[in-house]
């Protein structure tokens, strides 16, 4: 019985040493990059986009609330004018001003600059 125990112990030691040298043991758990929690902990709350603390949340929490906020700020919304529409409106007003100026409709209004350029003024 003692001889069988010695052989079993020797066999187990041999298997353990071979598995350790060949890399057959249990693989170590790999870390796969950053998570939101680790980045938030290391970088601070100001480094994470759309960070909201627990005290800032009113009413619903989570994805539903964020989706409602995104829908309210949608660029095609009627409530919020687009900056591009302001630019387009300004360009359209300027073009209509130039058209009226060419047609002579603005000649009688005071404060409108003349159609002559600075070169024409220097020549005369």
Curated annotation (Swiss-Prot):
UniProt key word Secreted: yes
Record-level Gene Ontology MF annotations: galanin receptor activity; neuropeptide hormone activity; type 1 galanin receptor binding; type 2 galanin receptor binding; type 3 galanin receptor binding
Record family assignment: Belongs to the galanin family.
Keywords on record: Amidation, Cleavage on pair of basic residues, Hormone, Neuropeptide, Phosphoprotein, Secreted, Signal
Protein name: Galanin peptides
PROSITE patterns registered for this protein in UniProt: GALANIN
Top-level taxon of origin: Eukaryota
Transmembrane parts of this sequence: none
Principal localisation: secreted
Function: Endocrine hormone of the central and peripheral nervous systems that binds and activates the G protein-coupled receptors GALR1, GALR2, and GALR3. This small neuropeptide may regulate diverse physiologic functions including contraction of smooth muscle of the gastrointestinal and genitourinary tract, growth hormone and insulin release and adrenal secretion.
Keyword Signal attached: yes
PANTHER family given in the database record: GALANIN, GALANIN PEPTIDES
Compartment(s) of residence: Secreted
Tissue-level expression: Expressed in retinal progenitor cells and retinal ganglion cells (at protein level).
Pfam families listed in its UniProt record: Galanin, GMAP
GO-annotated biological processes: nervous system development; neuropeptide signaling pathway; parental behavior; positive regulation of cortisol secretion; positive regulation of timing of catagen; positive regulation of transcription by RNA polymerase II; protein kinase A signaling
PTM sites of type Phosphoserine: 117-118
Signal peptide: 1-19
Species of origin: Mus musculus
UniProt propeptide residues: 20-30
């Amino acid at each position: 019985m003692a001889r069988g125990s010695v052989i079993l112990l020797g066999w187990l030691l041999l298997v353990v040493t071979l598995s350790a040298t060949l890399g057959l043991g249990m693989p170590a758990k790999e870390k796969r990059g950053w998570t939101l929690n680790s980045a938030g902990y290391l970088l601070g709350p100001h480094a994470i986009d759309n960070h909201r603390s627990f005290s800032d949340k009113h009413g619903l929490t989570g994805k539903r609330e964020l989706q409602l906020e995104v829908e309210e700020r949608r660029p095609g919304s009627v409530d919020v004018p687009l900056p591009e529409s302001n630019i387009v409106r300004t360009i359209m007003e300027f073009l209509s001003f130039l058209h009226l100026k060419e047609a002579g409709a603005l000649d009688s209004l005071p404060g409108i600059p003349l159609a002559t350029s600075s070169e024409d003024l220097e020549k005369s």
